[in-house]
Amino acid sequence: MQYPTVAQVVLDGPDARKLAEFYRQLFGLRYRDGDEPPPDGEPDPRGADWLVLRNPGGVQLAFQQVDQLPEATWPEGEHPQMLHLDTTVPSVAALNKQHERVLALGGRLLHDRSDDPEEPLRVYRDPAGHPFCVFVHEVDPETDRS
């Protein structure tokens, strides 16, 4: 049997370029050809519509411009999240390093469980209000499929 393949995860936001830049810098991704930011002062028609970040060997991220997007009120509230990204790092030291990067890039800390001995993690909100997680997960490439 053949199954569909996930091609990309699409995140809506009121500023697609700003959101794409946040994730490009956070994950070290590159733009799809033609989606790169224009020179300063030039119009950015693609940035006001749809952008794609390539992730060699993984699922790509796309960003769609919307007029309004209420922030998700995680973990409960009027605007529950519909999707979030789970990302991993190999150690608590790496978790702490990424914490500084996320904040410097404009992310906001929502929940800090970095001292949890079983699964250290932090939950953040990206510049458009989407929650995402960074947690410690030591991967054994021979056995791990998560």
Regions found by a protein language model. Give the residues of each.
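Short, flexible helix/strand-to-coil boundary loops that buttress conserved ligand/catalytic motifs
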Residues: 23, 67, 99
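Short, compact, well-ordered microdomains
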Residues: 93-99, 103-137
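Short, solvent-exposed beta-alpha or beta-beta edge segments that form flexible loop/patches at the rim
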Residues: 62-70
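A short, polar/charged loop-to-alpha-helix boundary motif
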Residues: 140-146
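Vicinal oxygen chelate
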Residues: 5-14, 48-55, 59, 72-98, ...
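Core segments of cupin and vicinal oxygen chelate
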Residues: 1-4, 10-61, 104, 112-115, ...
